[in-house]
Amino acid sequence: MALTADVKDELTKVEVSKTTVRAAELATILRFSGGLHLIGGRIAVESELDTPELARRVRKDLAELYGVRGVVSVISTSGVRRASQYLVRVLDGGETLARQTGLLDAHRRPIRGLPNRLTTGSREELAAVWRGAFLASGSLTDPGRSAALEVTCPGNEAAMALVGAAGRIGVAAKAREVRGVHRVVIRDGEAISAMLVQMGAAQTVSNWEELRQRREVRATANRLVNFDDANLRRSAQAAVAACARVERALEILGDDIPEHLQYAGRLRLAHRDASLDELGHYADPPMTKDAVAGRIRRLLAMADKRASDLGVPSTEASLPADFDEV
C-alpha cells in the first residue's frame, strides 16, 4: 500500500485557510474514522487514524475550529492490526462538538450519512469532504487492470453521500457492498487522477500517471508480442501444410505437370520457411506473392482432381495429424 501511504502523507500536509473547508474535512474524518460513544453517560467523539501526523492535524483543527481538546492515545499492533493506530478522543464538550460538526442531528440522533451542509457545499468543500474520507479510510492501488481509488464507508447512506459529492465535482464514483462492508470506488484511470488532483495530491498524481503510462506501454507491447507470436504460429503452420500438400501433389501428378506449376511447387519445397512474398523474390524471374500463391493453388487443384479420378487419397490426406485449421 505504498501509494496509499504516499497520498495520505501528501494530503496531511495540504494547507487550508478557509474555515468552512477545514470544517468539512474534519467532520468527514470524524464520520469515517470513528464515531460517537457513550462514556460515563456522556457523548464522546472518537477518531481512529493511521498516522501520528494525521492525529496531530485532527487535534489542531479541533482546537482551532471548536476550542476542544483532543486526547491522543496509541492503539498497539495486534493479531488483526498490522500497524499502530492513533485514537483521538474528545470527551469534555463531546456532545457540543458532535452537534457543531453535524454528527448529531437536532434531536440528538447520530446522522446516517453525511451532514447536508457538507454534501451541498462549494467545490472546495466537496473536495475537502473527499480528502477527509480518504485520509480516514481510503486506499489507492497500483495502476493496471484492477486500479482503484477506494474509500470504506460507515454505512450505505454515507457511501451514497460520497458518490454524490464526487459527482458534483465532476468525478464518476460507484458505491458497492461486499459482505456487509460499504465502499465507494473510482476505477477509471482519468477519474482517479482527477480526484487525486481535487483532493490536493498533485505529486502523487504525477507519480501515479507515470506508473500508469509505463504499465500501458508494457501491456501494449505484450499484446503486440502475443499478436506477432500468433501470426508467426499461423504462418509456420500454413507453410508446413502447403509443403505437405505440394509433396503429395507432385507424387500424384508425376511427370504430367505444366512446367510453371511444377516450378512453383519445387520453389515452395526449396524454401519451406519462406513467406509467399519471400518465395516471389526467390523466383527467377521474380514473381509477386499473388502469382506464386495462384500457381501453387492450381497445382493442388489439378492434383486433387487427378486423385479423385484415380480413387486415391488427395493432397489433404498428407496433412499432419495434429494440423489445426487456421
Curated annotation (Swiss-Prot):
**Origin: domain of life:** Bacteria
Q: What is this protein called?
A: Probable cell division protein WhiA
Which source organism?
A: Leifsonia xyli subsp. xyli (strain CTCB07)
What GO molecular functions are on record for this protein?
DNA binding
So where does this one cross the membrane? none
UniProt similarity note: Belongs to the WhiA family.
**DNA-binding region per UniProt:** 275-308
Record Pfam families: HTH_WhiA, LAGLIDADG_WhiA, WhiA_N
| One Gene Ontology biological process | regulation of sporulation
Q: Which UniProt keywords apply?
A: Cell cycle, Cell division, DNA-binding
Q: Could you tell me which InterPro entries the record lists for this protein?
A: Homing_endonucl (IPR027434), Sporu_reg_WhiA_N_dom (IPR018478), Sporulation_regulator_WhiA (IPR003802), Sporulation_regulator_WhiA_C (IPR023054), WhiA_LAGLIDADG_dom (IPR039518)
Role: Involved in cell division and chromosome segregation.
Matching Gene3D superfamilies? Homing endonucleases
